[in-house]
């Protein structure tokens, strides 16, 4: 009956146990955040003292290139600096270009336009849990996106 990501307080209990072990060996933990921007889970993780590994940058960069505007990308970058949120980001990975994460920082119409553009260039949409029209990510390279 629980969601599959960040179940409170269970997630924090597990992370604290692992952190105690990791601290003994001077190993830092890097929780992966795969949730919509509007949920602000990256802030919760940062407020608990962890760096965050999130997935906003790839889609925001493509959006900036496609719209010829860095406004939303700059807004996000300024926000993480102002709030002193320590992040690790990537531009691409084996999973594709994340889209679910952009909900809340981009309008749904803008996300759909990105999907349509990338699919029009040969990309594929990976739907969340197999549900049609419930986008999760686009499988494409930056070159073809």
Where do the language-model regions lie?
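Active-site and adjacent substrate-binding regions of carbohydrate-active enzymes
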Residues: 1-145
């Amino acid at each position: 009956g629980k969601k599959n990501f960040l179940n409170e307080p269970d997630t924090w209990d597990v992370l604290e146990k692992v952190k105690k072990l990791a601290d003994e060996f001077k190993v830092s933990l890097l929780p992966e955040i795969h949730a919509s921007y509007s949920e602000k889970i990256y802030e919760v993780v940062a407020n608990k003292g962890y760096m965050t590994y999130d997935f906003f940058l790839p889609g925001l960069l493509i959006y900036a290139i496609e719209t010829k505007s860095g406004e939303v990308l700059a807004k996000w970058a300024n926000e993480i600096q102002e709030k002193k949120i320590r992040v690790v980001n990537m531009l691409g990975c084996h999973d594709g270009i994340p889209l679910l994460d952009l909900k809340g920082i981009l309008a749904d119409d803008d996300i759909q336009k990105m999907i349509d553009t990338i699919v029009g260039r040969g990309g594929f949409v990976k739907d969340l849990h197999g549900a049609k029209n419930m986008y999760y990510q686009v499988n494409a390279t930056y070159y073809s996106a």
